[in-house]
Amino acid sequence: NRIDQLASQLTSNVRAANSTYPTSMREYEQRRDYQNNAIINCEQILKELQRIVEIFEVDVNTYGRYVNAIDREIGLIKKWRQRDNKIKAYLQGNV
């Protein structure tokens, strides 16, 4: 199903970003792209859950813990990107 596909893509993007330690700006940008795609996957999963609630008239509270977990994941990825700004500054020679 769609949520399963998106979750698989999310996992792949996080793993790809995590397996790359940037030593050049190109690698930094590639890692950033994976991180951004992971955030997009999270947003897509949230949208699919919302669609399920609307179409099947499911109690929205049924998915509350999943929504919270996905929101937490988005926050963690965003913090990760912020920490990577130090790598970017180093690669640009601004350290």
Regions found by a protein language model. Name each.
Residues N1-V95:
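Amphipathic alpha-helical assembly/interaction segments
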